[in-house]
């Protein structure tokens, strides 16, 4: 049977845009591509999974519709369309044109009406029709051959036929959806309905009377307040039904030939995807062979009506490839030539280097080849044999070059190359220049991989590794499987392009004002992190095994208790089944929250609020916590121990966060739980080297101290300088108590206010977090700003600075760009404003600990200490310490942490010693 898909464009565009609201997709020209990307992903998913015969996309028209003419308040409550969505719409229409997919519009009618009319016509002709939309009002159109295709919360789609729509809303037939909406209204469209009548009552009334009209004719059968509400609002109910009714007689023709899915205009589609920097989507939509054509003209003025301020990078007019450019790449495969080029490189001041290896994990990688470049478009590739002894001989030829401190070493993610070379006895020396980190400091929100940077900075399309070893998967080859002749262009290009990127990015660092941050903090930190990753950290597997046994037994006991309380067994890991037990069977609350698809919400946040309602809620939360602890850490960590070293080797990432904080992966040690007895057991398993001590030092309330410095608030500065507990001091001032009389509850509230306000917490957010009324939360925030007036001034000034220049900065001039700071949409603007307040605080704190790490590392080297820095977790540094160096290490660490930056308040670090991380922390 033929299939027709009709897309509700704006509903999907809005959904896509807000899905990325916390982490918007911004390309190198500053264009927010979230809405376009999300829409394209949906389109591709439908085309590949559902393989429709016909497809059309309906848009709301410009100007009024019959509903707004009849009711000026229709949708009037909605905030102004975000600028980024307005910019996205013409781009999406251009994409659809290139895809040869019709855009469906009718003056005076909404997309709903156009879809409704075409869906019914197509269904009547025997075409199975799917209306792709998240909007519930489409349920009224569902009938034979006409179904809803609705995005699920969290991914995927659900198909709703007439039976499912009726079951969902508890009605007899789908036409009654409009009767429900007429009674209960629809806040999304500002349809008023009948005041005081919710979904439950509306369903009951429609099941009893059949329709709004029948109900209004028989109001004498109603009683009390409900009778009065319905009679007093009869006209409003009828009018609400009119507004909710989707028109099915719009003057549009069903032309299946025009709607037939066909091959796209590949050249035009490629132009648009290239301009958007959608490489993955281009690969998805276009034939791979076509997509790899090496000359792609970019229509630079495609989006010229929306220029972006503060643009750092511009795109060249075409993407060039290696075979179009004069270049000299040489394969060096004999010892005599190797020595000659090494001597040649030793006369240069700058060397771009790269390694080809067998693994993306540096600790396990073996060398396949070495690449070098000292001049743009010239590069050399040296293959390295499999035999370790032979490989070492070749590395030794270049060892003096790598270890020459007078030569600047340039690399893309150079930390990886340094670690690989370290396993061959090479200690890379000299000033470093990492192109990935340089690009990150200039535009932190963008991608920083070489392929992307080559395209956006150099207008150059690199050879992709998949062209050599195939796509990811079981059949992907290793670089070791290829002869050197096949690798040379790819490997030499890496070193060459890295050098070109260095020459392009270096002046940009100066333009943005981050040269000092780059050379004095981020580049020295590369060495620190490389050594920490190579050192790794020891894990007490016996302790973890014991913890696993204890927690698994507890988990089993909790499960039994949950089943007892529920009166039946069910899948505790299933949110759906948990919701049905808590709210369907036990009815622990009268009006539980539901998702748009009608499923009960059982998130941790919701269950925390309900934990006092029934014992089962606390048990489910406890079960979830233990399950996560076991799966993520207790049972997982032993499997991550490297069998050769006996250590866990995490990767520290310098370019993963917008704020400048370090993150870690494989495994993520930043999220190891701190609170709770069970979480502490994890830290207990982290131990120092054999015969060593574990030393931990962490900053005390560094973000609040940074806030005190930035705001210059005298009261906050005085509280820190006097050495008081800052939260007790805050509570004393807010509640006008002597600090000795502050209660634990008052201190807790002040602590939440202290940290919450840094993150731009609202009255509603603080009320929820503290489980207090909004009035009390409002009084607490007001009291806070009366106590610390300059904190409020700082917050307002930070937002104003961001509005004027488009970004905010840390102490060290690290920038956070905020393209949405002047948005007319309150939700979007609110995110940007909170980031304007928080980014300088969190970013400065991140920079301070980086400074401390660099200085501590240098002091350890200068004093020839054998003790090692092994972990960094947010504001905390951890060390494996040789016992006789104990006093020296503590002195150095505290001196450098507390002296990393001169604040108006003391920078304090607390420290501790032990046999493991828990004891030391």
What are these regions (language model features)?
Residues 2-132, 136-163, 236-239, 245-253, ...:
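Noncatalytic, basic helical substrate-engagement surface that gates or grips nucleic-acid strands
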Residues 3-5, 15-54, 72-73, 77-84, ...:
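Conserved RNase H-like, two-metal-ion catalytic cores of nucleic-acid enzymes
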Residues 73-87, 143-172, 227-229, 380-400, ...:
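Short alpha-helix plus adjacent loop in nuclease-associated cores
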Residues 185-208, 273-277, 540:
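Helix-hairpin-helix
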Residues 233-386, 412, 445, 453, ...:
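Conserved "right-hand" nucleotidyltransferase catalytic core of DNA-directed polymerases
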Residues 477-480, 534, 642-645, 649-650, ...:
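Conserved catalytic core of nucleic-acid polymerases
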Residues 509-521, 525, 848, 852-873, ...:
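Active-site palm subdomain of RNA-directed nucleic acid polymerases
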Residues 553, 557-560, 564-618, 786-838, ...:
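C-terminal polymerase-core module
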């Amino acid at each position: 049977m033929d299939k027709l898909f009709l897309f509700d464009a704006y509903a999907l565009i809005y959904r896509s845009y807000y899905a990325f609201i916390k982490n918007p997709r911004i390309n190198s020209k500053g264009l927010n591509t979230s809405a376009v990307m999300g829409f394209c992903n949906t389109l591709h998913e439908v085309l590949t999974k559902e393989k429709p015969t016909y497809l059309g996309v309906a848009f709301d028209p410009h100007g009024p519709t019959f509903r707004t003419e009849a009711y000026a308040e229709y949708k009037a409550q909605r905030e102004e369309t975000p600028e980024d969505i307005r910019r996205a719409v013409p781009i999406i229409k251009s994409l659809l044109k290139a895809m040869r997919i019709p855009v469906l519009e009718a003056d005076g009618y909404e997309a709903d009406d156009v879809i409704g009319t075409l869906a019914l016509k197509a269904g009547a002709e025997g075409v199975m029709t799917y209306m792709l939309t998240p909007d519930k009002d489409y349920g009224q159109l569902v009938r034979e051959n006409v179904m809803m295709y609705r995005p699920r919360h969290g991914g995927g789609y659900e198909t709703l036929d007439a039976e499912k729509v009726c079951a969902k809303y508890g009605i007899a037939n789908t036409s009654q959806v409009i009767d429900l909406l007429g009674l209960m209204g629809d806040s999304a469209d500002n349809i008023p309905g009948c005041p005081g009548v919710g979904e439950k009552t509306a369903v009951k009334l429609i099941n009893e009377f059949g329709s709004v009209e029948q109900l209004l004719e028989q109001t004498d059968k109603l009683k009390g307040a409900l009778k009065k509400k319905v009679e007093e609002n009869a006209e409003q109910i009828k009018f609400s039904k009119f507004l909710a009714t989707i028109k099915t007689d719009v003057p549009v023709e069903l032309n299946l030939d025009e709607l037939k899915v066909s091959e796209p205009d590949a050249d035009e589609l490629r132009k648009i995807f290239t301009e958007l920097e959608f490489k993955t989507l281009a690969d998805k939509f276009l034939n791979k062979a076509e997509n790899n054509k090496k000359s792609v003209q970019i229509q630079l003025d495609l989006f010229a009506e929306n220029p972006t301020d503060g643009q750092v990078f511009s795109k060249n007019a075409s993407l060039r490839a290696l075979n179009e450019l004069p270049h000299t790449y040489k394969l060096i495969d004999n010892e005599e030539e190797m020595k000659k080029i090494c001597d040649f490189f030793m006369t240069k001041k700058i060397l771009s280097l790269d390694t080809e290896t067998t693994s993306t994990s540096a600790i396990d990688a073996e060398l396949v080849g070495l690449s070098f470049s000292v001049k743009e478009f010239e590069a050399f590739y040296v293959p390295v044999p499999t035999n370790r002894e032979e490989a070492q001989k070749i590395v030794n030829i270049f060892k003096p070059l790598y270890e020459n401190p007078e030569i600047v070493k340039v690399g893309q993610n150079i930390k990886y190359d340094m670690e690989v070379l370290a396993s061959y006895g090479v200690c890379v020396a000299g000033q470093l220049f990492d192109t990935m980190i340089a690009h990150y400091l200039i535009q932190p929100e963008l991608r920083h991989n070489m392929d992307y940077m080559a395209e956006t900075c150099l207008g150059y399309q690199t050879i992709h590794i998949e062209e050599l070893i195939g796509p990811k998967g079981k059949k992907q080859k290793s670089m070791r499987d290829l002869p050197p002749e096949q690798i040379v262009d790819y490997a030499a290009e890496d070193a060459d392009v890295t050098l070109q990127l260095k020459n392009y990015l270096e002046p940009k660092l100066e333009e943005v004002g981050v040269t000092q941050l780059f050379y004095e903090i981020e580049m020295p930190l590369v060495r620190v992190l490389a050594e920490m990753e190579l050192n790794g950290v020891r894990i007490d597997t016996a302790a973890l095994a014991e913890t696993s046994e204890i927690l698994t037994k507890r988990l089993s006991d909790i499960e039994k208790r949950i089943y007892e309380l529920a009166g039946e067994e069910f899948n505790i890991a299933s949110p759906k089944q948990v919701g049905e037990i808590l709210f369907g069977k036990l009815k622990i609350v009268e009006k539980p929250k539901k998702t748009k698809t009608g499923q009960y919400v059982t998130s941790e946040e919701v269950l925390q609020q309900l934990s006092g309602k029934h014992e089962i809620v606390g048990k489910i939360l406890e079960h979830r916590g233990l399950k996560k602890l076991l799966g993520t850490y207790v049972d997982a960590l032993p499997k991550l121990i490297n069998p050769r070293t006996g250590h866990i080797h995490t990767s520290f990432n310098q370019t993963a966060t917008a704020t400048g904080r370090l993150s870690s992966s494989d495994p993520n040690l930043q999220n190891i739980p701190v609170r709770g007895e069970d979480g502490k057991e994890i830290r207990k398993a982290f131990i120092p080297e054999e015969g060593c001590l574990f030393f931990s030092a962490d900053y005390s309330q560094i973000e609040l101290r940074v806030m005190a410095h930035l705001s210059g608030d005298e009261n906050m500065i005085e509280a820190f300088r006097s050495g008081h507990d800052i939260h007790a001091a805050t509570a004393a001032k807010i509640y006008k108590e002597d600090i000795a009389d502050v209660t634990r509850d008052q201190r807790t509230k002040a602590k939440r206010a202290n940290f919450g306000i840094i993150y731009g917490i609202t009255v509603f957010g603080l009320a929820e977090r503290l489980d207090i009324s909004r009035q009390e939360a409002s009084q607490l925030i007001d009291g806070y700003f009366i106590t610390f007036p300059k904190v409020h001034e700082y917050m307002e000034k930070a937002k104003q600075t961001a509005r004027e220049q488009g970004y905010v900065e840390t102490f060290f001039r690290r920038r956070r760009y905020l393209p949405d700071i002047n948005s007319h949409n309150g939700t979007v603007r609110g995110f940007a404003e909170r980031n304007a307040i928080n980014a300088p605080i969190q970013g400065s704190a991140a920079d301070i600990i980086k400074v401390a790490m660099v200085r501590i590392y240098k002091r350890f080297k200068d004093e020839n200490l054998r003790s090692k820095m092994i972990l960094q977790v947010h504001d905390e540094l951890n060390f494996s310490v040789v016992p006789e160096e104990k006093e020296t290490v503590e002195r150095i660490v505290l001196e450098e942490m507390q002296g990393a930056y001169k604040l108006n308040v003391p920078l304090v670090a607390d420290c501790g010693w032990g046999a493991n991380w828990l004891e030391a922390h």
